[in-house]
């Protein structure tokens, strides 16, 4: 099919077309086609009955020219970023750049700037501009584009274009810089589907849209009364909006072919008259010689004529005629000068002018290395895109306001010195203040800037030291100022070693401050602490001035010390092999008994006051009970059972063997037989635990063991009085009674000597005989917990706080001494904040009997499950008929790690923070020759001759 028009890509105009255009002389009207399209070739000319060549490829900034011979109009088809084909190309390029994330805001700004650049070219190179819209409604964002076009023309183009046009073949256009105030027309390719497509409805819809567009353009001064100040022109008495209501554009060719086939096959019946029925009977078949269509009436003819006349081409030619007749400005503006802006050029003049504009506005902008002497034009090339991004300027302005508000909110609320937690809270408040004003794409960068400014302000002499205390509280002193001691401004209430005096203590930052210095300081203010007898724990005694802390492997501290302990055990293991063989040949039942009694005895029966048959448990010469002590224990059990003292009546008795007392002089000469050598150059940095090196001692004692008075100072009827033990909660100030039944048995090898003593008995042995070989002990025990507010209370079970005397039952104490007692427990005090109380003291009231109570508490703490001990090779003996208090460490430390208390306890696992192991009490025969306050003067026999309760 021959086309009745020519098409080419600018600037490659064919010679034959150029000759035909030359014949028009100064009657050439240039029409620009811009807007939106949906087809692959970005074609907006289909409504004009034109299309590009099949091999045509759409490109951004490309101009396709169309000319129909016999007319005076040259149509320029501008391919812009508003065409879907070109928009898709831009998106593909952005997606290929995997290093840069896709930013919609910057992409939209870049797309709009390119469209504005092409629109500037169209408004200066054309007399008429047709804006094509694929939808049935006007896009209000086009008003924003017109505003940007007016800004760009007045602020940029008019600054350099007149001067630069004088230096080109288009010098004729240097004064006016454009052909005219171009008349803007609007083409809507689709009509609303729900509206009837009659002449009246289409015209009414076109008039309604014209009124809307006119009001918008007049309101934003896009169209004015003067052609010199107006960006575009609108005709006063002519239609400038066209709706394509009858022709389907961009239709599916397959569906069109199917529809044509259906119409060809369908023949509707015509209305036959009665007289024609005889003629129709002669027809060879039905439908013979019947017309294909119904007869058309006058209304149908009028409708078809309207469809024929209502075309885009006729719509455009009415405005082209205004341009040819020279009444272009008169038909658009009320005010116009005698020498109006409108002018017609021949093809050569227009081509020179178009080439200059295209180079200045499009080509040079694509070359970042373009050099020019015109400063205004240089500014245009450099800042054109940035100057059009008014949204970015708007969002930037809002973010600046929000930034000022956020900074002011931060600085006004900031104290003189504050820590990171306060800084984060102030920054959060500043962010809220910022968000009251700051919005848009720049908000994220502005928030980062706000955080940086606030961070710098905080670190500029206002930052706290924030060294964490052992209770996980930060130091509040200024970081940039030197300070000898840290201070977290957190005050705790704690009691002294004896529990009589309570005082305020600062949050500790060192183990020495936590476990030693505070108690030494408050002891000076306590009337009781300075009088009581204290057990002396072994501590490090340096022999050089440059002593240091022992080094441990950071990753495996327990493994290192365990290996060293194992090596020492191997070196000290010199038992003959025949003893090992003899042990293996023991009956199975006896081996089970030995295993059960290896270092710990059987627990007491929960029945109050019952007799128990407990085996003698030697603690050994070290904290890791050696195999030798275990074998000695087995031998002693065999001797006990073979002596014939066991019977059916005494199976549940606690057996204590009475040893023959040695001479005092002999024991003093012997000294500590099993004393281990200790280091005098390296000390243990933490607390003593079960796998720590035996030769390392701590710098200071973290435990305290003191006798605060005789047993008579405690009355079970009134409990602990406030003048003696202050700070106890009501009803939680009672100790738990514990009855233990003993059976005294003489050692087999001393029976002859004992028989000799019976013939010449002393007073002490005479009192024993009067009491028989059984002895009932009444011990009072209390597990005291203390919270940071100074509240103290006893517990009657691992999960129950003592509420008064009614909570004390027959087996209450057994629940405490024979179960794991939690190291931390919620304080029952009434407070909005839940405080954790810590096991701080163990109260023991010893009986008035010829035996000593042995204490050996072990506390299991931490993820590595350190088991901390008193650190004494020989467990302490408590004197008879006395009130003893064991004060536990305030803070626990392993080899190289501080074990901080938990923030809260899980209800299903109260022992997660740590616990006191059961079996800490033992009983042994009283030995008057031993000094209970001097552990170094106690022999190895003291560690062996007692029974664990």
From Swiss-Prot:
Protein function: Involved in nonsense-mediated decay (NMD) of mRNAs containing premature stop codons. Probable component of kinase complex containing nonC and recruited to stalled ribosomes.
Organism: Drosophila erecta
Record protein name field: Nonsense-mediated mRNA decay factor SMG8
Biased composition (Basic residues): 749-768
Pfam assignment, any one: Smg8_Smg9
Biased composition (Acidic residues): 571-581
Segments for region (Disordered): 564-607, 624-652, 748-768
Polar residues: compositionally biased ranges: 594-607
Similarity comment text for this entry: Belongs to the SMG8 family.
Residue runs in coiled coils: none
InterPro entries: SMG8-like
Gene Ontology annotations of biological process type: nuclear-transcribed mRNA catabolic process, nonsense-mediated decay
Keyword Translocase attached: no
Keyword annotations: Nonsense-mediated mRNA decay
Low complexity: bias regions: 624-648
């Amino acid at each position: 099919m021959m086309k009745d028009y020519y098409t080419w890509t600018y600037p490659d105009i064919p010679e034959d077309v150029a000759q035909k255009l030359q014949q028009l002389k100064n009657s050439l009207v240039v029409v620009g086609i811009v807007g939106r399209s949906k087809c692959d070739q970005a074609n907006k000319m289909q409504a004009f009955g034109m299309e590009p060549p099949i091999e045509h490829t759409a490109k951004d900034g490309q101009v396709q020219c169309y000319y129909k011979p016999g007319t005076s109009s040259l149509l320029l088809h501008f391919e812009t970023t508003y065409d879907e084909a070109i928009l898709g190309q831009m998106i593909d390029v952005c997606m290929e750049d995997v290093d840069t994330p896709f930013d919609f805001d910057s992409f939209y700004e870049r797309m709009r700037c390119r469209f504005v650049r092409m629109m500037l070219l169209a408004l200066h190179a054309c007399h008429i501009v047709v804006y094509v819209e694929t939808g049935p409604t006007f896009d209000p964002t086009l008003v924003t584009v017109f505003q940007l076009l007016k800004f760009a023309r007045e602020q940029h183009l008019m600054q350099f274009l007149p001067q630069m046009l004088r230096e080109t073949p288009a010098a004729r256009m240097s004064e006016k810089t454009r052909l005219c105030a171009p008349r803007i027309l609007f083409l809507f390719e689709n009509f609303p589907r729900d509206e009837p497509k009659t002449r009246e409805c289409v015209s009414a819809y076109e008039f309604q849209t014209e009124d809307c567009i006119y009001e918008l353009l007049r309101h934003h001064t896009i169209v004015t009364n003067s052609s010199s100040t107006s960006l575009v022109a609108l005709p006063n008495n002519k239609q400038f909006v066209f709706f394509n209501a009858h022709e389907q554009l961009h239709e599916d060719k397959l569906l069109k072919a199917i529809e044509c086939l259906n119409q060809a096959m369908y023949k509707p019946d015509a209305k036959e008259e009665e007289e024609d029925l005889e003629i129709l009977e002669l027809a060879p078949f039905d439908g013979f010689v019947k017309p294909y269509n119904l007869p058309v009436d006058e209304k149908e003819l009028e409708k078809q004529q309207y469809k024929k006349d209502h075309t885009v081409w006729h719509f455009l030619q009415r405005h082209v005629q205004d341009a040819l007749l020279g009444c272009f400005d008169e038909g658009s503006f009320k005010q116009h000068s005698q020498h109006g802006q409108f002018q017609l050029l021949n093809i050569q003049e227009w081509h020179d002018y178009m080439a200059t504009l295209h180079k200045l506005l499009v080509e040079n902008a694509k070359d970042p290395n373009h050099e020019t002497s015109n400063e205004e034009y240089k500014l245009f090339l450099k800042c054109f895109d940035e100057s059009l991004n008014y949204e970015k300027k708007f969002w930037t302005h809002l973010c600046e306001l929000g930034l000022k508000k956020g900074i002011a909110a931060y600085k006004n609320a900031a104290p003189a010195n504050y820590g990171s937690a306060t800084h984060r809270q102030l920054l959060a408040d500043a962010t809220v203040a910022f968000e009251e004003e700051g919005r848009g794409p720049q908000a994220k960068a502005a928030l980062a800037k706000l955080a940086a400014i606030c961070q710098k302000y905080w670190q500029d002499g206002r930052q706290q030291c924030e060294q964490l205390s052992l209770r996980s509280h930060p130091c509040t002193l200024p970081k940039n100022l030197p300070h000898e001691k840290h201070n977290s401004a957190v005050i705790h209430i704690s009691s002294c070693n004896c529990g009589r005096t309570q005082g305020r203590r600062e949050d500790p930052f060192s183990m020495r401050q936590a476990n030693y210095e505070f108690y030494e300081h408050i002891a000076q203010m306590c009337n009781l602490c300075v009088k009581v007898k204290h057990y002396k724990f072994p501590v490090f005694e340096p022999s050089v001035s440059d002593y240091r802390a022992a080094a441990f492997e950071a990753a495996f501290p327990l493994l290192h010390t365990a290996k060293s302990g194992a090596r020492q055990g191997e070196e000290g293991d010199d038992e003959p092999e025949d003893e090992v063989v003899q042990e293996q040949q023991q009956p199975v039942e006896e081996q089970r008994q030995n295993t059960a009694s290896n270092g710990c005895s059987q627990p007491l029966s929960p029945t109050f006051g019952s007799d128990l048959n407990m085996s003698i448990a030697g603690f050994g010469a070290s904290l890791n009970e050696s195999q030798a002590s275990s074998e000695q224990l087995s031998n002693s059990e065999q001797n006990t059972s073979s002596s014939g003292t066991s019977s059916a009546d005494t199976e549940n008795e606690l057996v204590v063997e009475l040893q023959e007392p040695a001479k005092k002089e002999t024991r003093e000469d012997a000294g500590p037989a099993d004393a281990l050598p200790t280091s005098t150059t390296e000390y243990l940095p933490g607390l003593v635990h079960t796998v720590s090196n035996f030769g390392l001692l701590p710098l200071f004692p973290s435990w305290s063991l003191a006798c605060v008075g005789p047993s008579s100072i405690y009355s079970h009827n009134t409990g602990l009085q406030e003048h003696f033990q202050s700070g106890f909660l009501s009803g939680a100030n009672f100790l738990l009674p514990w009855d233990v039944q003993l059976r005294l048995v003489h050692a087999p090898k001393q029976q002859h000597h004992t028989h000799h003593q019976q013939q010449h008995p002393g007073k002490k042995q005479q009192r024993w005989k009067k009491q028989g070989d059984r002895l009932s002990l009444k011990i009072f025990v209390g597990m005291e917990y203390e919270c940071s507010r100074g509240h103290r209370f006893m517990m009657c079970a691992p999960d129950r706080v003592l509420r008064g005397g009614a909570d004390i039952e027959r087996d209450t104490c057994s629940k405490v001494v024979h179960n794991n007692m939690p190291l931390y427990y919620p304080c029952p005090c009434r407070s909005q904040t839940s405080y954790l109380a810590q096991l701080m003291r163990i109260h023991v009231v010893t009986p008035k009997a010829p035996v000593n109570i042995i204490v050996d508490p072990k506390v299991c703490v931490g993820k590595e499950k350190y088991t901390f001990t008193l650190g004494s090779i020989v467990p302490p003996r408590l004197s008879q008929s006395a009130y003893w208090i064991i004060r536990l460490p305030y803070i626990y430390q392993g080899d190289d790690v501080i074990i901080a208390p938990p923030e809260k306890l899980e209800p299903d696992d109260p022992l997660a923070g740590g616990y006191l192991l059961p079996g800490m009490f033992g009983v042994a025969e009283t030995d008057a020759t031993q000094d209970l306050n001097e552990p170094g003067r106690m022999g190895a026999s003291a560690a062996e001759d007692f029974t664990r309760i």
